[in-house]
Amino acid sequence: MVTYLLANFGGPRTSQEIVSFLQALLTDRDVTGGMIPSVLHRPLFSYIAKRRAPHVARQYAYLGGGSPIFQDTERLAQNLSQELQASVIPFHRYLPETHRETLQALQESQGSIVGIPLFPHYTFAVTGSIIRFFLQHLPEKPISWITQFGVHPQFVSCMQQHIRDCLAAQQIAVEDCYFLFSVHGLPQRHIRLGDPYAQQCQASFEALRGELEGEIAFQSKFGIGKWLDPSTQEVCQSLRTKKRYIVIVPFGFVSDHIETLYEIDHLYVPILLQKEYRVVRIPAINASSRWVSSLAAIVRSSPQETSLEPLLMP
């Protein structure tokens, strides 16, 4: 008997969870640990989280006060459970209010556990953080992990068809489009530590782009230091093309959340509109029936990692 652990980023369901969400995220040393000495880390970033909460709350107000990522992940877990005919337990990494229920369900599970982080590309700061969480909180339950799927044929074909369907629904010809494939950025210091994220993103982009005209860019920078480039904002500012449409494809996100619904729509799209382009943001694949069946095929065919130390931030 196999139990599947479906792990996603998590997000505040209501405005009341914004502070705890930010504290869980910013005090995670896999995310921000390289910036300051460990003794100062938790108190400083707890303070920063509280200071940033009102600003972030105004962004979430555009989404109705909370993120849809929780419900989308729960729905995907239910649908994937039906597809796999097995138990699928959802996990929301930075929604601490849900952790006890997840840990209890895993503790009571029988047989092996396979972890499925919903991130196409592996990075110490996200998938590595999820793996570390369970090594710390559930050490008696070994979990094998599917650590990336960005070039898996099922993911590539699902995304390509999703893009075509979205454009066809708006009667937009692919030939009239320039594609901006946007993925979450990462500090370059992580790459110097051996993080494979940039290489995996590039390979995934090349597989997805195929014959389309476009480029890759990195969004969502925060904090100090140099990040992967070019940034999505810089590309939007410098972009010159004769194509009528700019199509933004957030291919590193399988769920819509603040970085697609607010950041792209409110920070990047206006730059392109001012340049008189027509702009389309491709929605994330979320819990669509095509993605459910594709994800099930990925789960059935992907190798599982059991040697976990190399997967963690050094």
Swiss-Prot record:
It is found in: Cytoplasm. It catalyses: heme b + 2 H(+) = protoporphyrin IX + Fe(2+). Disulfide bonds: none annotated. Belongs to the ferrochelatase family. Catalyzes the ferrous insertion into protoporphyrin IX. This is Ferrochelatase. GO terms for cellular component: cytoplasm. GO terms for biological process: heme biosynthetic process. The lineage of its organism: Bacteria, Pseudomonadati, Chlamydiota, Chlamydiia, Chlamydiales. Fe cation binds at residues 184, 259. Pathway: Porphyrin-containing compound metabolism; protoheme biosynthesis; protoheme from protoporphyrin-IX: step 1/1. It is an enzyme of class 4 (lyase). Keywords: Cytoplasm, Heme biosynthesis, Iron, Lyase, Metal-binding, Porphyrin biosynthesis. One of its GO terms (molecular function) is ferrochelatase activity. Its EC number is 4.98.1.1. It holds the Pfam family Ferrochelatase.
